Amino acid sequence: AAEKEGVTNFPIHIKLDTGMHRLGFAPHDVPELIARLKRQTSVIPRSVFSHLAGSDGDQFDSFTRKQIETFEKASEELQSAFPHKILRHICNTAGIQRYPGAQFEMVRLGLGLYGVDPYTNQMLHNVSTLKTTILQIRDVPQEDSVGYSRKGRLNRDSRIAAIPIGYADGLNRRLGNGNAYCLVNGQKAPYVGNICMDVCMIDVTDIDCREGDKVVIFGDALPVTVLSDVLGTIPYEILTSVSNRVKRIYYQD
């Protein structure tokens, strides 16, 4: 594309496959890559990078060290062929923490930007909160059920609140039926019955609350890692599942 536009020395970023086998040039392709780059003037390498496959797991330490070693050798080979400085980066959030010697000229902080440590699965400093408000509260007798397929069964007469958030907003259906909870006025309110598309129900029997009160799905007091642990997944999935129809508000200190 650069050649067709008559552009010269357009900076590009070169990805190396050091073991994740997703994208990138294999290390043994580097000599041919250098030769092709040398035969043209449209683009020049600005940076070279790779991705660590298991930097957040102790069991993968030997593999991670091998990846770093492979990357270092291949990037040195590329650098030696060009007079200008080529930036190197391979560390993700866990890599930054666990392999400081592999930070090179740049790093790529991913999940850490959102205050989550993928190595310990603990919070650093939370920066995101998903919240809603109570839409309606009703008294439901023990013998009745709540939600679709009558999945929400009660062990006592209960106060059930409906909140306007559902799986179309990114609230996973597997959190329903008491598998997880949200916070109402700082107290745990379990999800009752199936999570619906636009609404879900929570048990507020023992909570002093009223319609319009704030409900925290995840945030400072309820880390996103709690939900990811329940679902057997990673915090990334929870955060990226929040749909576009959920209003975003950005704060700047």
State the predicted function of each range.
Residues 13-15, 47, 108, 162, ...:
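Conserved beta-strand segments that form the floor/walls of ligand-binding pockets within enzyme
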Residues 2-11, 18-133, 137-141:
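Active-site loop/helix belt of alpha/beta enzymes
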